[in-house]
């Protein structure tokens, strides 16, 4: 059963510029995500769009969540997946979310993410 959906569209250039600051990287991305971003800066916008979409799916936005508590990684085939920690993990557990499905699309200028929470 679907528990929630979230979508986000973000400008790649804005995220790339923000990533020039270590404080932004540390606040928004886990160590594993930072490794991914160092290898491919475009992943920063993709991941941030997923984080925004997950926060919307949970129904709070970032008012009560920390972006780094939503970790976005890729499996060996490149499929994105999400790990939740802290308040994001607790909220998902309270809502009975057992799986989060993620889709990312991007162009040179924009990254888009769509997520579905499922019981």
Q: Predicted regions span which residues?
A:
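Core catalytic alpha/beta fold that binds nucleotide/phospho-ligands
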Residues: 1-119
């Amino acid at each position: 059963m679907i528990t929630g959906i979230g979508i986000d569209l973000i400008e790649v250039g804005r995220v790339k510029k923000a990533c020039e600051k270590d404080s932004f990287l540390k606040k928004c991305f886990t160590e594993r995500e930072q490794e991914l971003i160092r290898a491919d800066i475009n992943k920063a916008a993709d991941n941030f769009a997923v984080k925004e979409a997950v926060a919307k799916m949970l129904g709070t936005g970032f008012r009560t969540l920390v972006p780094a508590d939503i970790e976005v990684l890729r499996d060996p085939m490149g499929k994105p997946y999400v790990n939740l920690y802290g308040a994001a993990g607790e909220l998902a557990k309270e809502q009975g979310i057992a799986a989060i499905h993620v889709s990312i699309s991007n162009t040179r200028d924009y990254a888009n993410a769509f997520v579905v929470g499922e019981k």
